[in-house]
């Protein structure tokens, strides 16, 4: 017989209780009442966070769920978060945490091997030991990034400004669709991990920031064209040194960028994406603004490739970026 919807399986109950920090005690009505939140509002927030639908009579919530709802209500009441952005904040946080959780469960599986699936007690014990360490590391890394981002924003931007001129870069793995068909799951996981690790290191070393990675593509942002050029060229150079990764095609565009909830938007982002789509393997294409900013720098060579045929940007001029010989 299958488990009731919204409840963990009996085999996973011990592990879930360990991870959640306590036993399930409440239905969703009871949680909402204890937190002083209408059930409809609580359900909207849970949906934004990507949580599975829970039946009315399912006892799956813990004391931590009550505390979390109360905290969010307090942030809105204190006008730290506008009511209309409540769900957006929850959604953005959940998307980040969901990916982190997938990676962390992968660590558990690699540590325990077959025991992960058959020895629930051991899995729960390992979780009990590892989780506090992971929590401390997450808090440390988050605070470090928060401090760096806050310092950068305070130093470089006008108060309240959401838009500024930056360089957007897209790096895309050539032939990724074919690789998905030909690679095993393990081979594909190693490829993606290697790509993300290499890209993240190169971007950070050259003062950029990885906005997001989506399978075969990494989106990064920098504050000037020279940094973006170094990232793009170094990525292709490093990729060429290894047999583990296919070549990349990269597009760079400079212009106004709107930053919201950790993501970036605007025509500059779209132009960089379009340039990437028409770039040749192991090459870098840049738009007019990036080319103008780099022109005259002895370390780079710019080759006009003329107008490109890309969706939504007719006659978009592009230049191939290379190092000077």
Please describe what each predicted stretch is:
Residues 1-34, 38-156:
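Arg/Lys-rich, alpha-helical DNA-contact motif
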Residues 158-234, 238:
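Catalytic NTP-binding/metal-coordinating core of nucleotidyl cyclase/transferase enzymes
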Residues 206-213, 238-251, 308:
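Catalytic core regions of nucleotide second-messenger enzymes
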Residues 217-219, 258, 318:
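Short aromatic/hydrophobic contact patches that present stacked aromatics
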Residues 221-226, 250-264, 281-282:
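Catalytic strand-loop-helix junctions within cyclic-nucleotide turnover domains
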Residues 258-280, 311:
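Catalytic-core segments of nucleotide cyclases and related cyclic-nucleotide turnover enzymes
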Residues 282-325:
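Cytosolic regulatory/linker segments at or just downstream of nucleotide-handling modules
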């Amino acid at each position: 017989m299958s488990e009731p919807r919204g409840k963990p399986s009996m085999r996973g109950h011990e592990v879930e209780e360990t991870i959640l920090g306590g036993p399930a005690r409440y239905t969703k009505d009871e949680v909402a009442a204890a937190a002083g939140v209408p059930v409809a509002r609580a359900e909207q927030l849970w949906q934004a966070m990507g949580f599975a639908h829970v039946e009315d009579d399912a006892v799956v919530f813990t004391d931590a769920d009550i505390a979390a709802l109360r905290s969010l209500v307090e942030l809105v009441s204190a006008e730290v978060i506008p009511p209309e952005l409540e769900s957006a904040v929850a959604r953005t946080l959940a998307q980040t945490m969901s990916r982190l959780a997938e990676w962390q469960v992968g660590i558990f599986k690699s540590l325990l091997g077959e025991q992960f699936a058959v020895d629930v007690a051991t899995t729960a014990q390992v979780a009990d030991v590892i989780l506090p360490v992971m929590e401390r590391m997450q808090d440390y890394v988050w605070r470090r990034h928060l401090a760096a981002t806050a310092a950068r924003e305070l130093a470089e931007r006008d108060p309240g400004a959401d838009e500024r001129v930056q360089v957007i870069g897209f790096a895309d793995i050539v032939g990724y669709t074919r690789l998905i068909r030909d690679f095993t799951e393990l081979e594909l996981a190693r490829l993606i991990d290697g790509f993300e690790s290499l890209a993240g290191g190169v971007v950070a070393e050259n003062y950029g920031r990885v906005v997001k990675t989506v399978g075969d593509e990494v989106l990064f942002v920098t504050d000037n064209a020279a940094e973006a050029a170094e990232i793009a060229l170094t990525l292709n150079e490093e990729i060429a040194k290894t047999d583990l990764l296919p070549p990349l095609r990269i597009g760079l565009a400079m212009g106004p960028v709107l930053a919201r909830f950790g993501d970036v938007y605007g025509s500059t982002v779209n132009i960089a994406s379009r340039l990437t789509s028409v770039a040749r393997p192991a090459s870098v294409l840049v738009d007019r603004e990036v080319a103008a900013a780099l022109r005259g720098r002895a370390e780079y060579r710019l080759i006009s490739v003329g107008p490109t045929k890309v969706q939504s940007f007719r006659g978009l001029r592009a230049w191939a970026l290379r190092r000077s010989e």
